[in-house]
Design a protein with these regions (language model features):
Chain A
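Thiamine diphosphate
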Residues: 1-167, 171, 175, 307, ...
């Protein structure tokens, strides 16, 4: 184990996979000479050269399509979106082509592509650069969607994503890039896609969160422990396919569930989780499932308004207390 | 299996080798007959969804494929039956696909607009206008990445030219010197909208020039006068160039939707099969049985 930042963990994953497999290459805006808008690809051009670290002009649809075409005939591209908000420009390529080629060609062609970059609320980046983009992708059959919370997950899940034979949407976070954590240096270390993790054991209530919301929920759990509430924290890590088994298992244990997500709540992750928990574990629930979500508005710029838009510790704590108080607790 | 003309050594211009001329005619006739049968089955309700026929444009696919090697790639939009047949796909498996059968090329999951055949390097079958052009650049990038000497032919219609991805793809292919041949089948109508109503520059080949891609306009109805992809073009692209071609072609059938009406302008365009000159002079020295030539004329 080594202690490193989330950014360094991603860089290590890219480097190891590029060393392991000559078909893996990186393509996107500023990934080479500039070494990445957020320095995730730092040093890759120097080690692997311009053949495998391809700088593109600003044309998300074009270079995503290039990645898909290259993947159809045997390469394994890692496409960087400078921020995932820009992936909307390539949404047609991702949804209509990458996600569907394997199916609509009757299995003749597959698209082993990873599309990665930061997304979600950051630091006053305002309406067009702060969206929780996962919702746009996890609805689509044929796509896998990953949101890695810790440096260790960032490395292990990115490596699995690159090794996957089908398209993976891998959304990081600007605010997590400098976060430090323990990361295995073993080049064979991977975390399988579709596996949730219990980050904190508890018995009174299950809280599901990922990315920045998980760090916030962790603080809430520590605070509430002082009040005698025992919170179990589950991080899905992969949103599609979702590890429903781990989530249901936790709900059967605690009988209460709160889902926290940074994005707007309507038809969000929390809606889906509440739905399958109700379908599969209705009799285990002692209280209605609660969702703590971002406000139903674009992200404002002003710092105080930005804070109002995203789920706060207070809101999370209040939801946890409500579900624990329901039905006599 | 369909006969492919892919392995023939083509000689550009009017001095077309009679053997090649015969194969070109065979490919064109195969496409014409396939499409006529598909139209019949569509009318009978045995083929569903959209059916975009290639009738009237056969010379482009036949001519272009004649200059390719079997291991070269072809990628197309949704009026792709002819490109897929010319590349050498099994017409029975293609028709099975149109019928939605499990023995179809894509196991019945793709249909008319999503024909793929990995065994002949036919990469589809893409039904969002313009979206497959960046894919072609990606295939070109992979060829260059691996240091191979294949080329990819990218067929598209005049309707794709107004899309941003046309320009993004040409820019990237030119910038990175990718072995892509862009072949525009300009039948002058994107569904019901004429190029005059859609493009500020209707000389489509000039867009290629803008990106520094050697480009030219050819007559897509003159299969032997100017083969759609001449061997010298292919070899130049193989050696690291790019190439753009805009073919004038005539689509005889209207668009692919049930109940699609042909506008007057569309209805009045022709749909004859261009018979290669050496064969058109039949029976004087073409070596072709009478039947072949006469059937071709019948199709005119």
């Amino acid at each position: 184990m080594a202690v490193m930042t989330y950014r360094e963990a991603l860089n290590m994953a890219l480097r190891e996979e590029m060393r392991r497999d000559g078909r893996v290459f990186v393509i996107g805006e500023e990934v080479g000479l500039y070494e990445g808008a957020y320095k995730v690809t730092q040093g890759l051009l120097k080690e692997f050269g311009p053949r495998r670290v391809v700088d593109t002009p600003i044309c998300e649809s074009g270079f995503t399509g290039v990645g898909i075409g290259a993947a159809m005939v045997g390469l394994r591209p890692v496409v960087e979106m400078m921020t995932f908000n820009f992936a909307i420009i390539a949404l047609d390529q991702i949804v209509n082509t990458a996600a569907k080629l394997h199916y609509m060609s009757g299995g003749q062609f597959n698209v082993p592509i990873v599309i990665r970059g930061p997304g979600g609320p950051a630091a006053q980046l305002a309406a067009q650069h702060s969206q929780s983009m996962e919702t746009y992708f996890y609805h689509v059959p044929g796509l896998k969607v990953v949101r890695p919370t810790t440096p260790m997950d960032a490395k292990g899940l990115l490596k699995s994503s690159i090794r996957d034979d089908n398209p993976v949407i891998f959304i990081e976070s600007e605010t997590l890039y400098p976060v430090k954590g323990e990361v295995p240096e073993d080049p064979d270390f991977v975390i399988p896609l579709g596996k949730a993790v219990v980050r904190r054991e508890g018995k009174d209530v299950t809280v599901i969160a990922y990315m920045g919301m998980m760090y916030r929920a962790m603080e809430v759990a520590e605070d509430l422990a002082k009040e005698g509430l025992s919170v179990e924290l589950v991080d899905p890590r992969t949103l599609r396919p979702m590890d429903t088994e781990t989530i249901i298992g936790s709900v059967r244990k605690t009988h209460r569930l709160v889902v926290v997500e940074a994005g707007a709540g309507f038809a969000g992750m929390g809606s889906e989780i509440a739905s399958f928990v109700t379908e599969q574990a209705f009799d285990d629930l002692d209280a209605p499932v609660e969702r703590v979500t971002g406000a139903n508005a674009p992200m404002p710029y002003a710092r105080n308004l930005e804070k109002l838009k995203t789920p706060s510790k207070d809101k999370i704590a209040a939801a946890v207390r409500r579900v624990c108080g329901a039905n006599g607790g | 299996m369909a006969k492919t003309v892919a392995q023939q050594k083509a000689i550009p211009g009017p001095g077309l080798d009679p053997q090649l001329a015969r194969r070109l005619l065979g490919t064109m006739l195969l496409i014409r007959r396939f499409e006529e049968k598909a139209a019949e089955a569509y009318t009978l309700g045995k083929i569903g969804g959209f059916l975009h026929l290639y009738i009237g444009e056969e010379a482009v696919a036949a001519g272009a494929t004649s200059a390719l090697r079997p291991d070269d790639y072809a990628i197309s939009a949704y009026r792709e039956h002819g490109h897929c047949l010319a590349k050498g796909a099994d017409p029975r498996r293609m028709m099975a696909e149109l019928f939605g059968r499990r023995d179809g090329l894509s196991k019945g999951k793709g249909g008319s607009m999503h024909l793929f055949d990995r065994s002949v390097n036919f990469l589809g079958g893409h039904a969002i206008v313009g979206a497959h052009l960046p894919l072609a650049a990606g295939v070109g990038l992979a060829i260059k990445y691996d240091g191979r000497d294949q080329v990819v032919v990218c067929y598209f219609g005049d309707g794709a030219v107004a899309q941003g991805e046309f320009h993004e793809s040409l820019n990237l292919a030119a910038l990175w010197k990718l072995p892509v041949i862009y072949l525009c089948e300009n039948n002058r109508y994107a569904m019901g909208t004429s190029t005059e109503r859609a493009l500020a520059q209707t000389e489509i080949w000039k867009f290629g020039q803008t990106y520094g891609i050697a480009s030219e306009r050819v007559d897509g109805m003159d299969v032997d006068g100017d083969l759609e992809v001449r061997p010298d073009v292919r070899d130049r692209v193989r050696a690291g160039g790019r190439h753009g071609r805009s073919c004038r072609a005539r689509r005889r059938r209207p668009g692919g939707r049930p109940g699609a009406r042909r506008s007057d302008a569309v209805a009045h365009r022709g749909g004859h099969l261009p018979v290669p000159r050496p064969l058109d002079a039949r029976p004087r020295g073409s070596g072709l049985p009478d039947q072949g030539g006469s059937r071709a004329r019948e199709a005119a």
